[in-house]
Each structure stands twice: as C-alpha cells, then as structure tokens.
C-alpha cells in the first residue's frame, strides 16, 4: 500500500495531465479516510525521496485543515491537539512547515480552554535542557501570532503562555545568548517582542522585573558585533522591541505607568538613543532591517518636544551625514540611468519599492515640520541644501553632482512647507538651479530638475523664466534618452498651474498627451496616468476636440497591459486603474448627448468588454463606473450596451456585493434611460436575481450597504416602469414588499438603511395602495410599518425623501376613511406638517449645491498637513442631499399636489379626517408654505 501511495503522490506532478488528474481524484477520495491521512506522518512524510516527502506533507496539511470540522475526523482532531508538538519535535524542515500550518489552524479553530494541555506540554519542553524541545515550544508560541482568530483573545493566550513558561523563556533566551546560539535567540526574541506589542499584556510581562530583563537583553543584543544571519535577525527583533516599547512609553500606552517611567528615564533613554544612533552610523546593506526600526525610533522622537531634544545636538549629522548621502546618486542608480533607464525609472517612481528612502523621507519631513518654527535651525538646513546645489553648479564634479541629485530630492519633499513659509526660496530654486540644470550638461541633473518641477502643484510666479523652463522641458520630451523623455513629460505638470506659461502649454497639450500615451505603452508608471487625468480635468475643452481618438488610444494601451499576463504587480494595477479613471474623467467632461460621447463609447467598448468577459475583477469598479458614465451622459442605451449590462448582471454574487453601489447605479441608469426595454424577460429576471442576492439573504451574509443597493434598484423600477411592470406581472409587488419587511428586521435602525426600507413600502403603496395594504396585513406588518415611519420621520432629510412622503400621504388622503383602521391619523398629520414645512429649505439647500457645483476645489498641500484619522471622517447616519442623485421625482411639483388635496378634501376621505385632527398652529404652518412663494427644484 505504501508503494502505491508513493506512486500516487509522484503522479500528481507528472508531466502527463491525464495521470495528474487521475492521481488527484484518487487523493480526494482517500481524503475521506482519516486513517489513511493520519498514517502519512509515519510513512510517506518520512520517505527518502524528497519529492514524495514534500508532496505528502502538503497533502497532509491541506487534508487536515479542510476536514478539521468533519465528524469523521473527530479522533484525528483530538490526536493532533495532543500530539502536534511531538510530531514537530521529530520532524524536519519539510514536515515542520506542514505542522506549523496545522498549529495555526488549531489556534484558529479550537477553544482556548481545550488547549491547556498543549500549553502545559510546551512549558514542559521549555524546562528541559534539550535545544530541540525548547525550539518546539518557542515555535508553538510564535505560531500564536500567525493565528487571526486567537488574536481577539490574545491577553488570555499570553497569560496562559507566560504563566506556564514565562520564567523559563527568559532564562533560556539568556542562556542561548551566552552560548552564541543566535538561531534560538532569534525565535525567543520574536516571541518576546511580539508579546509586548499589545496594549493589554498579562501580569508576568507587566512586572517591572520582567520588563527590565527583556529591555536589558534587547539592549545587549543590539550592541553585539557580527554578521551572522541569525544574529542580525535577533538584532532586528530586539530593535523592534525597543522601538515599540519606547513608543508605548512616550505615548503612555502601558497600563502600568511604572513601565512608561522605566523606559523614558533620562539616563536609560539616552542609552537607547545612543544605540540607535550607532546603528545608523555603522549602517550596511546587511543591517537595513535593523536600520528601519532605528529610523522609526527617530521619527517617534520628532513627535514629542520633550524627546526631540535628544536629537537636536545631532541634527547636522542627521541631515548632512545620514539622510543626504542616502538620497544622493548611488553607483547603481548612475549605471541604471545610463544603461538601464527602464530600471532607473521603475525604482525611482515605485512608491513601495524602496523602504529605506521612504522611511528617510518621513524622517526628514518630520524634522522639518519640527524645526520650521525655529527660524535659525530651519534656515540653516535650507541653506545647507541650497549650498549643495550651488556647489554642483559652480564645480560640476561627479561627487558634487551626486550630492545635488539628493538635495533636489529632499527639497522637493518639503516643497509645500517652502511654498507656505519660504516661497521666495522655492522661486529661487527654480530660477537659479532648476532652469540652469534643464539647459546644463549633466543629464542626471536634468532628470532631477524635471522631477522637482513635477512635484510643484501651485502657480509659482517666475515671470518670463516660466516660458524658458517650458521650452527646455519641451526639448527634453524629444530627447532620445528614455529616462529624460519620461521625466520631462511628467514635468509638464508644472505648467498646468503656471499662469505665465498657460497659453503656450495649451498649444503643447496634443504633443504632451501623445508623449504620455506613447510612454505608457512601455512603462507602468502611475504618475503618467495621473498627469493625463490632470490635463483632462484642467483643459476639458482642448481635450474634447479629439476625445474619441484619445479614448481609443487609452483603451488600446490598457488592453495591451491587461493582456500581458507576464506583467503583474501593484505598478500594473495602479497604471491600468489610472487609465480607466482617465477614460471616466474624460467622458464626464464632455457635453451630454453629444456625438463625441457616442464615438468615445464605441472606442472603449473593447476594454470594458474584456474586463467583464475575462473576469479581471481588480478592475470591475472602474469598468462599472465607465459604463455608468456613458449611460448617464448619453442619456440613452446604445445597442451593444445591453450585452455589457447582461455581463454585469451575471457577475458572481461575491462580486456584486463588493460593488453593490456601482451595480445599483448602473441598473438605475439602464432602467431610467432604457425604460420598458428593461422589461425583456431575460433582463428583468436578471435584475430581480440581483435584488434577491443583495437583499434576500441570511443574517450572516446581510449587509446594510447591499440592502440599500437592492432598495434603490426597486425604487428605480417603480418610479420609471412601475405601472407597466405591475400591470404585466402583479407578482413583483409581493417580492418588493418582502424585501423591505425581511430587510427591516436585520438592518441597523440607527443607519440610513431604514429610510430605504420605509420608502420602498411607500413607493409600493403610491403605485398600488389597496394591494400593498392587503400584503402588509397578510404579513402582519401594517401596524409596525406606520410605527416605524412615525418614529423615523426625522431621517427623511433629502428633497427626494420628502417628496416620497408627500406622495405617500397624498395617496392615503384619497382613501376612504376606514380603509386603514390601523392608522394613527394624528401621527400621520404630524409627519405631513413636518415634511411640508421643511421641504422649502431642503430645496433651497439642494439648489444652492447645484449653483456651487462648478466652484473650483481648494488646493490641498499634503506633506506638512496632518493626516486625517478615522475620527476626522464623518460617516453620517442620516442621508445627506446629493445633487448627482437624479430621479423622475425631480420633476414632481409637491406643493401644488398636496395643496389640491388639502384645499378641497373629498367627503369621507382621510384628507378630511387628517385636517380635522390638526391644531390651528399646524394649519397655519401648512398655509404659510402652500400659499406662499413656492420654491422650484433646479434640475
């Protein structure tokens, strides 16, 4: 049997697809036999053939994780919880990988109370003198931090871990450090540093004796010399502990103030500072991971005035001896610029690629932010960086040019601070260093001069020099040097904002756009797509002249990127997304219903179709937004749009729920502009299927956002084709009402979803009052509906909401008294008065927003502004007015409608009854609005 099993495993990697398929099917069947799977650690996972061992280990891991909850594996599950540490103990590198995955699975799926035995066994291993036993225990502790679900209970887990083995962990790590066993030190430091990372830590770790022990251990490790790989890893985790501990101490995040006081003690903190300073002074390529934590530590110091004083004596070193040299042109960059410009550009503009420079940029900007109010210090740093540029200009030696390259980088990173605090300095840099560099002899400084220009997003008054800068930049666009072609094209963004050169720049827009598109065929550079988007936004009239051709070019380039399967990664995703956003921006800048729009749609059909047909899910949102934009702007449905629409409707439920808002917008637009064409059985069936997927699901999968999307689709159906649909198929009405009733039981009533649920029922009522009353009674929901409506009336804030309320109340007013014995007439009267009297102000607000729509947005500088955190972002629970939300109700005149009903109520109707219950004050309020000047909603 063992030989047969070996052959099956070998056949899973056979070059013959048929054999692979048969072997995989056999293994799937064998997976149902726990006895077979559990035999593998003692058979094939010990095989002499490394291929058999590896395949068997992978299969064992996957089978155990997949079947973990099945009844057939209950005994196997129990066995593994009790014996996984023993399996790991006697495993090797291959099998231990599988056992680690199972360990994480155990932590994710088993109750902590059921793992007590495992932790006690690990504690026993920690007390032995056998290194392999200790490694097994430490490895188990490390796996705790890989388990997502157990993290929610981490304080208890850490309590169990350190209550049973805390003292032994400390002693063993110290012992391994003494003996030079850095592999074990590394694992121990991972466990200790990650354990101290959390806000809530158990008593053992909170004890000052333990904390001081780990602190001194980390400090000692950081000061060790050597290039041993495990030692460097140990130092990395010691640096992590030290940085995190100092951060918690400075911010007073420790529950025990004693720990914060210990770590921030002046003498002790000075030792930490000196240690991190030594790390950056003695830096090497091997120690970059450690160095990054040192930089994080220094950034931390800039956040607090009391601790920044530690850095102040060394500011000159930080700028001139550390940051600038690492930003200066390196040998490899110089070689790439000349011989591999593709690599040079890729690394220069890859925002995620160079962690060291990114961290250094943060440190430099934080230092500038801290000293900008200290005039002498601030001016000293700026003067130093300018002197570097001046030295290169006067004596263009190789070393001076390299330093100037870095100085341009650093000055560009603080250009917003310079714009606010020292605008004259920025003007000086452009006039005296950027423009001379553009016309100079050094290609690499031309590159940096272009880079510097590309970062400035405000009008810089450099008078006639602006035209000279534009001419020189334009010449570089025609250069044969690929890097200079790209960077000079990007530098054209400077002239978007420069008034003095705006007319000349307009003439160069076609050439600039052509350069962007040509270069985008070769480079996955997001700044190119961002520049294109900016040109479209700032010069819509110029762009619209050849919009179809531009859309076609962008679509072809985007398709080529999408079809290139070998081209993967974040850069590609950002570039493709950027191009798709450019198409969307372009079509929204064109005149509605224009032929240019229709031609543009034809030219972008292929890329939208490809994304949907080939399931390029990373770009679904962009494709949906583009298609939505076309339908909304053209105001009719082009023939081929129906095919794209059907593809969207057929998306898997997981994708529809991710993009429920976009899908709802699209369906709304197709219904609005397609009208009764949507009533095609296939299309309508697919739309109703989407509604069911979004709204009629169990509570576990229910989301308010999805429910809102479904309600919006139903509302669009009712407002646009409601009568036609219900005349043809009355069974749709119960479906719509059931969506509201079932959803109302699961939504968050404090959020906006309740408004959609109530309005859905009101819309059904307006369209078919008697049938709606009957269905609500059958569902025993009529009374609840009115109670919800009255209690939630203050949430109907939008003009759209108030118009629905008035139509709904108007429909009730026409019913004969007695048709709704469940109705609280007085309560409905209050809703009527509140709605009518608040509607004029709501319309004024919406009209004002319409008038303000074209107001230019304020320019925002980011680098020295505070970043918004979650508390700064308002996520309102009340629906706010949205001028881009358009429906058939926009044309409805509500004041005349309700006035005609109330001014001469039919005898025996609810209108008569509602009026009779009103107070004189309520009647006067209504009269003032209905008989006064009527505010008309702008469309």
From Swiss-Prot:
Gene Ontology biological process terms, A to Z: protein import into nucleus
InterPro entries per the UniProt record, alphabetical: ARM-like, ARM-type_fold, Importin-beta_N
Gene Ontology molecular-function annotations: small GTPase binding
Any one GO CC term of the record: nuclear envelope
Domain annotation Importin N-terminal: ranges: 23-90
Keywords: Cytoplasm, Nucleus, Protein transport, Transport
SUPFAM superfamilies for this protein: ARM repeat
Chain's role: Active in protein import into the nucleus.
Name of the molecule in the record: Probable importin ECU10_0620
């Amino acid at each position: 049997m063992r030989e047969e099993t070996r052959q099956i495993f070998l056949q899973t990697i056979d070059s013959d697809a048929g054999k692979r398929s048969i072997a995989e099917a056999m293994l799937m069947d064998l997976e149902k036999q726990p006895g077979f799977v559990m035999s593998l650690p003692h058979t094939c996972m010990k095989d002499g053939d490394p291929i058999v061992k590896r395949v068997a280990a992978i299969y064992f891991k996957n089978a155990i994780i997949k079947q973990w909850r099945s009844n057939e594996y209950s005994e196997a599950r129990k066995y593994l919880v009790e014996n996984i540490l023993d399996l790991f103990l006697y495993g090797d590198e291959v099998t231990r990988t599988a056992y680690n995955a199972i360990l994480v699975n155990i932590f994710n799926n088993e109750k902590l109370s059921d793992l007590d035995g495992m932790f006690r066994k690990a504690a026993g291993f920690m007390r032995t003198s056998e290194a392999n036993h200790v490694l097994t225990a430490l490895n188990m502790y490390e796996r705790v931090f890989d388990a997502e679900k157990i993290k929610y209970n981490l304080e208890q887990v850490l309590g169990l871990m350190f209550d049973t083995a805390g003292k032994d962990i400390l002693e063993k790590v110290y012992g391994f450090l003494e003996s030079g066993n850095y592999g074990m030190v590394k694992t121990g430091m991972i466990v200790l540093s990650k354990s101290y990372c959390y806000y809530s830590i158990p008593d053992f770790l909170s004890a000052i004796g333990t904390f001081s022990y780990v602190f001194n251990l980390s400090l000692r490790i950081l000061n060790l010399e050597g290039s041993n790989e495990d030692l460097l890893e140990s130092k990395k985790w010691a640096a992590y502990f030290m940085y995190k501990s100092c951060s918690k101490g400075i911010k007073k995040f420790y529950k025990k103030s004693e720990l914060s006081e210990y770590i921030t003690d002046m003498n002790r903190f000075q030792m930490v500072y000196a240690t991190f300073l030594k790390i950056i002074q003695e830096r090497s390529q091997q120690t970059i991971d450690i160095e990054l934590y040192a930089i994080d530590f220094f950034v931390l110091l800039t956040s607090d005035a009391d601790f920044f004083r530690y850095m102040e004596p060394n500011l000159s070193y930080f700028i001139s001896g550390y940051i600038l040299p690492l930003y200066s042109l390196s040998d490899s960059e110089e070689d790439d610029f000349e011989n591999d410009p593709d690599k040079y550009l890729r690394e220069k503009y890859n925002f995620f690629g160079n962690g060291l420079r990114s961290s250094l940029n943060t440190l430099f900007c934080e230092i500038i932010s801290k000293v900008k109010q200290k005039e002498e210090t601030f001016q000293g740093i700026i003067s130093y960086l300018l002197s570097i540029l001046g030295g290169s200009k006067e004596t263009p030696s190789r070393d001076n040019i390299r330093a100037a390259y870095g100085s341009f980088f650093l000055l560009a990173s603080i250009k917003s601070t310079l714009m606010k605090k020292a605008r004259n300095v920025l003007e000086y840099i452009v006039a005296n260093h950027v423009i001379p560099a553009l016309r100079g002899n050094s290609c690499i400084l031309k590159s940096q001069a272009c880079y510097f220009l590309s970062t400035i997003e405000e009008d810089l008054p450099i008078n006639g020099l602006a035209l000279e800068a534009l001419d020189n930049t334009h010449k570089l666009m025609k250069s044969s040097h690929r890097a200079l072609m790209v960077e000079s094209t990007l530098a054209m963004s400077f002239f978007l904002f420069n008034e003095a050169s705006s007319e000349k720049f307009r003439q160069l827009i076609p050439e600039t756009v052509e350069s962007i598109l040509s270069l985008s065929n070769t480079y996955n550079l997001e700044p190119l797509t961002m520049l294109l988007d900016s040109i479209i936004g700032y010069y819509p009239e110029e762009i619209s002249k050849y919009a179809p051709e531009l859309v076609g070019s962008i679509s072809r380039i985007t398709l080529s990127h999408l079809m290139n399967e070998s081209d993967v990664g974040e850069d590609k995703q950002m570039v493709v997304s950027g191009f798709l956003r450019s198409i969307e921006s372009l079509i929204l800048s064109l005149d509605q219903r224009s032929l240019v729009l229709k031609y543009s749609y034809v030219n972008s059909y292929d890329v939208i179709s490809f994304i949907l047909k080939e399931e390029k899910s990373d770009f679904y949102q962009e494709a949906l937004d583009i298609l939505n934009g076309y339908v909304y702007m053209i105001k009719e449905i082009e023939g081929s749009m129906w095919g794209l629409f059907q593809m969207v409707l057929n998306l898997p439920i997981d994708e529809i729920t991710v993009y429920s808002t976009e899908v709802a917008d699209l369906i709304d637009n197709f219904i609005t502009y397609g009208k009764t064409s949507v009533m095609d059985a296939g299309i309508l069936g697919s739309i109703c299927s989407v509604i069911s997927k979004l709204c009629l699901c169990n509570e576990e999968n229910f989301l308010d956002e999805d429910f809102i999307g479904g309600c919006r689709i139903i509302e669009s159906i009712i407002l646009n084709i409601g009568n036609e649909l219900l005349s043809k198929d009355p069974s749709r009405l119960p479906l719509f009402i059931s969506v509201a009733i079932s959803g109302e039981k699961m939504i968050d009533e404090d959020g906006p979803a309740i408004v959609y649920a109530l309005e859905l029922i009101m819309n059904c009522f307006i369209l078919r009052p008697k049938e709606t009353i009957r269905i609500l009674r059958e569902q025993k929901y009529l009374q609840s509906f009115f109670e919800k409506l009255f209690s939630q009336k203050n949430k109907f804030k939008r003009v759209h909401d108030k118009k629905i309320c008035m139509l709904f109340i108007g429909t009730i007013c026409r019913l004969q008294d007695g048709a709704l014995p469940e109705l609280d007439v007085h309560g409905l009267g209050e809703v009527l008065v509140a709605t009518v009297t608040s509607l004029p102000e709501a319309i004024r607000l919406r009209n004002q927003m319409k008038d303000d729509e074209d107001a230019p947005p304020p320019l925002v500088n980011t680098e020295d502004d505070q970043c918004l955190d979650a508390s700064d972002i308002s996520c309102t629970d009340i629906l706010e007015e949205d001028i881009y939300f358009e429906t058939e109700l926009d044309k409805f005149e509500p004041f005349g409608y309700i006035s005609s009903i109330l001014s001469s109520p039919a005898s025996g109707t609810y209108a008569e009854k509602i009026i009779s219950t009103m107070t004189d004050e309520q009647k006067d309020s209504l009269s003032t609005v209905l008989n006064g000047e009527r505010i008309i909603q702008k469309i």
